[in-house]
């Protein structure tokens, strides 16, 4: 079951500049960066209780974030909902006709399992479902 808005992700062409903006200009708490190999990104995390903001930047100029930046130059990339049973939610949504960008959940940040719902199924918005690892629930 979906339990919360987990985060809002913003694709950024310059990660250092974006991190500085969120730290210095907006005064947000920077929780660190993590390379997410499965997504081909470096992600910077900011706490904005009760949710988070993630700044996503492509690794080595490849992957879906690089494609997004080439087309749009940065901006809101996706919304992520936290779930306590990603497999059940995927099955339930598939039964309702939702399309996903992959066949099954993949590894996400902090040991989570994630899957994206295709924007065509959600009025043009890319939606991520994320089941946190036990340590981060």
Annotated model-derived regions:
Residues 1-19, 74-83, 133-137:
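N-terminal beta-strand motif that seeds the catalytic metal site of vicinal oxygen chelate
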Residues 4-6, 28-40, 60-77, 92, ...:
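A cross-kingdom feature marking solvent-exposed beta-strand/loop segments within repeated
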Residues 5, 12, 22, 46, ...:
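Short, structured motif recognition centered on aromatic/hydrophobic residues
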Residues 11-41:
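N-terminal first-folded block
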Residues 19-20, 66, 87-91:
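Alpha-helical elements of the RecA-like P-loop NTPase motor core of helicases
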Residues 36-52:
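C-terminal "cap" of GNAT-fold acetyltransferases
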Residues 44-45, 81, 90-137:
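Vicinal oxygen chelate
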Residues 50-53, 60-62, 86:
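Short, charged/polar surface micro-motifs in flexible loops or helix N-caps
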């Amino acid at each position: 079951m979906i339990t919360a808005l987990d985060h809002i992700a913003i694709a950024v062409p310059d990660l250092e500049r974006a991190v500085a903006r969120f730290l210095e200009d907006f005064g947000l708490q920077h929780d660190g960066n993590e390379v997410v190999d499965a997504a081909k990104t470096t992600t910077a995390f900011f706490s904005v209780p009760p949710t988070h903001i993630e700044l996503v930047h492509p690794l080595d100029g490849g992957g879906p974030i690089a494609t997004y930046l080439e087309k749009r130059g940065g901006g809101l990339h996706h919304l992520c909902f936290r779930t306590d049973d990603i497999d059940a939610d995927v099955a339930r949504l598939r039964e309702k006709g939702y399309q996903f960008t992959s066949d099954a959940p993949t590894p996400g940040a902090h040991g989570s399992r994630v899957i994206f719902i295709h924007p065509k199924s959600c009025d043009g918005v890319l939606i991520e479902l994320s089941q946190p690892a036990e340590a981060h629930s």
